[in-house]
Regions:
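Activation segment/activation loop of eukaryotic-type protein kinase catalytic domains
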Residues: 170, 175-206
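Short beta-strand micro-motifs within the conserved protein kinase catalytic domain, predominantly
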Residues: 97-117
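Structural motif in protein kinase domains
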Residues: 123-133
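Conserved C-lobe activation region of Hanks-type protein kinase-like domains
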Residues: 216, 221-228, 235-289
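Catalytic-loop of the protein kinase fold
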Residues: 157-174
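Juxta-kinase regulatory segment immediately upstream of eukaryotic protein kinase catalytic domains
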Residues: 1-28
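Activation segment signature within eukaryotic-like protein kinase domains
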Residues: 146-147
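ATP-binding glycine-rich loop module of kinase domains
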Residues: 36-88
Length: 353
């Protein structure tokens, strides 16, 4: 038996009426859900996803010597933040996010710390990694449609003062033919208190934009966080089509001594080299999608969204308009247009045959 109560909910009917019917095994290379244990739960003939907060993980990250009561407080605060942020987004008419539908706390006896806060979400069909086929052109329309959904979701969050910060393939959830953003746990909200608000970046560092890797931070909260989301959206486009993130492409083209894990200079000093690596990464991406219809349009979006310097990131027309650099409306329209063009091409090709 695991000493953590969060790992031992299987078979239990919780006080809120949810019966925990299956434990979800974390994938070997997964980088998410560090602080939680995931289950499938059912209630009233409805099957949902349950996220249990794991005290042992909070204790592990807090280090030795920290009072147990303080660690419990941190865990409870993280639980309340994600729950309340979900409510905040729903009130702001956000639709492209997987929301909390129930929550509670369970106490299990015979454990050193028996309290287990949990959140219940609508059950997705899976994350986007299970759906993508990197060599199937017929899947191209679906990819554009999914990216369109995600761009809408990011814009909706921005409209209510929220930055997702952790946009990556495992956090894109598939519901039938609709894609939604998952896991707001690391998001930042301008109007809500969170431990992450003191950070420059709160997402997965494997996907972080280059300015964060080189420890450069814009002072303005909106510029810093929204620029990050723009980069992550562009990186997601790269992943959808090549199966690799933009950060991995950038790293591939940076000389060893200039990579962020070795660099000891300033962001200003590394800019010329970063720009060269970016140009090479874009070229590789463009070559990699040469077989795709509309590849030039797609590459242009990635160029703009993933530009290595945040002040020049975004659509050129938006950059010229003060305060609108990171407005995603043009990209939402573009993705919708590209999807329709791709659908039309498939229709015409079928008619020819």
């Amino acid at each position: 038996m695991d000493i953590s109560a969060a790992h031992n909910l299987l078979g239990i009917t919780l006080q809120t009426g949810w019966k925990v019917i299956r434990k979800i095994t974390k994938e070997k290379n997964s980088t998410g859900a560090f602080f939680s244990v995931c289950y499938i739960a059912s209630k009233d003939e409805r099957t949902c996803f349950l996220k249990a907060f794991d005290f042992a993980k909070f204790q592990q990250i807090s280090g030795e010597g920290k009072p147990v009561i303080d660690i419990i407080s941190e865990m409870t605060k993280a639980f309340k933040y994600e729950r309340d942020l979900s409510v905040h987004c729903q009130k702001g008419y956000v639709t492209k996010v997987a929301f909390v539908i129930d929550s509670g706390e369970e106490f299990l006896k015979d454990y050193p710390i028996g309290i287990v806060p949990y959140l219940v979400f609508e059950l997705a069909d899976g994350d986007v990694r299970s759906r993508l086929q990197f060599s199937n052109y017929l899947d191209f329309v679906w990819k554009l449609s999914s990216l369109h959904d995600i761009a809408i979701g990011i814009k909706q969050l921005h409209n209510v003062g929220v930055s997702h910060q952790d946009l990556k393939p495992s956090n894109v959830l598939i519901f039938r033919d609709e894609s939604k953003l998952g896991d707001l746990g690391r998001s930042m909200c301008k109007s809500m208190d969170s431990e992450y608000n003191s950070l420059d970046y709160s997402g997965d560092w494997n996907y972080a934009p280059p300015e964060m890797m080189y420890q450069y931070s814009e002072v303005d909260w909106y510029k810093r966080t929204f620029a990050t989301d723009c980069y992550l959206l562009g990186s997601l486009i790269v992943f959808y089509l090549l199966g690799i993130s933009m950060s991995a492409l950038l790293l591939k083209h940076m000389p060893q001594n200039l990579r962020w894990e070795h660099w000891r200079g300033t962001f200003e000093e590394v800019r010329p080299y970063l720009l060269m690596a970016y140009s090479q990464a874009i070229k590789e991406f463009h070559n990699g999608i040469s077989g795709y219809y509309l590849n030039d349009d797609i590459c242009m979006m990635v160029e703009q969204l993933c530009y290595p310097f945040p002040e020049h990131r975004g659509h050129p027309r938006n950059i010229q308009s003060k305060g609108r650099n990171y407005n995603l409306e043009r990209y939402i329209s573009k993705l919708d247009l590209l999807k329709r063009k791709a659908e039309l091409k498939i229709f015409k090709d079928c008619c020819k045959n």
